[in-house]
Amino acid sequence: MSNALYQSSINSLPLLGHGKVRDNYAVGNDKLLIVTTDRLSAFDVIMGEPIPDKGRVLNQMANFWFRKLAHIVPNHETGIAPETVVAPEEVEQVKGRAVVVKRLRPILVEAVVRGYLAGSGWKDYQATGKVCGIELPAGLQNAQKLPEPIFTPAAKAEMGEHDENISFAEVEARIGIALARQMRDISIRLYKEAAEFAATRGIIIADTKFEFGLDDNGVLTLMDEVLTADSSRFWPADSYQVGTNPPSFDKQFVRDWLEAVRIDGKPWPKTAPAPQLPDEVIEKTAAKYREALTRLTGEELQ
C-alpha cells in the first residue's frame, strides 16, 4: 500500500511532536506545519497499520468545513501552501495532507457537542439519566435525537489516556466564565449549522468535537481538525433507526472489529499494542473515509 504515510519525516523543520494522527512541525515562531498521517487510533491506542488515503481525506474534509464555517469564528488557517515551507524532496509527504496554521495557545478542553444520544453519552445516560451532568428527559433510546444539542466538554488527556468528561462548571473554573460560555455558544452554533448542511447531503452528524486556542490578542480561534470522520460521528440518514447503532462513516468499523477480536481466547484489553488489522478491515475503513468525504462535501479526493 504505497500511498499510505504512517509517519512523516520532515527534516527541514523542527519537529514539535507526533500526536495520535498528526505530526507537528514549527514554521518560524508563529506558525505550524500539521501533517495528517494515515495512522488510526481507536480506544486511544494507535493501530500498527496505516489506512491508505485517510490523512488526505481528513485534511480535505477539515479544509472544507473551515471555509464553510469561517463566518462564525476565526480559524487557524493561514492560506500558506505547505509545499512552500518544506524541502523539495519532502513535498510528496505534505501534498494534500498538510496545512500551515497559526500557532495558538490551545485551550485544554475538548468542546464536544451532541445532537444525538450515542457512544459514551448513551452509556452515561443509561447509568444516571444525565450526560456530563446535564439532565435529559426520561425514556430516551440509543441513537435518539436530543430535544436540543448539548455541550458536553471533556478534559484533554495525555497521549494514551482516555479523555475525561467534565461538567460545564468545571470548564468555567478552568478557563473562566466568559471564555467558557463563548466556547459553548460558538460550538453549538458550529454544530447546528454543520448538521443542517449535512442533512441536505443525507448525513446525520450525531456528535462532534471542536478544539479551540487563543491567538496573541486573546481571540478565540477554531483549530486542529473540524467535523472530520475522526472527530465526529457521521451516520447515513437512510439507514438511521432509533434504538440501534447506525453504521458510522468513520472508524466504527475498526472499533467493532476490535470489540469482537479474541487474542488467546480473550478480548483485547484496549491497551497497546493493538492487534494487527486484517487487510479487509483496512480496505473497508479506507473506503468508508472516502465515501464520507464524497457524500458530505460533493468533492472527490484531490
From Swiss-Prot:
Pathway: Purine metabolism; IMP biosynthesis via de novo pathway; 5-amino-1-(5-phospho-D-ribosyl)imidazole-4-carboxamide from 5-amino-1-(5-phospho-D-ribosyl)imidazole-4-carboxylate: step 1/2. It catalyses: 5-amino-1-(5-phospho-D-ribosyl)imidazole-4-carboxylate + L-aspartate + ATP = (2S)-2-[5-amino-1-(5-phospho-beta-D-ribosyl)imidazole-4-carboxamido]succinate + ADP + phosphate + 2 H(+). GO terms for cellular component: cytoplasm. Its EC number is 6.3.2.6. It comes from the Bacteria. One of its GO terms (biological process) is 'de novo' IMP biosynthetic process. GO terms for molecular function: ATP binding; phosphoribosylaminoimidazolesuccinocarboxamide synthase activity. It is an enzyme of class 6 (ligase). Pfam families: SAICAR_synt. Keywords: ATP-binding, Ligase, Nucleotide-binding, Purine biosynthesis. PANTHER family: PHOSPHORIBOSYLAMINOIMIDAZOLE-SUCCINOCARBOXAMIDE SYNTHASE. Belongs to the SAICAR synthetase family. This is Phosphoribosylaminoimidazole-succinocarboxamide synthase. It comes from Cupriavidus necator (strain ATCC 17699 / DSM 428 / KCTC 22496 / NCIMB 10442 / H16 / Stanier 337). The lineage of its organism: Bacteria, Pseudomonadati, Pseudomonadota, Betaproteobacteria, Burkholderiales.
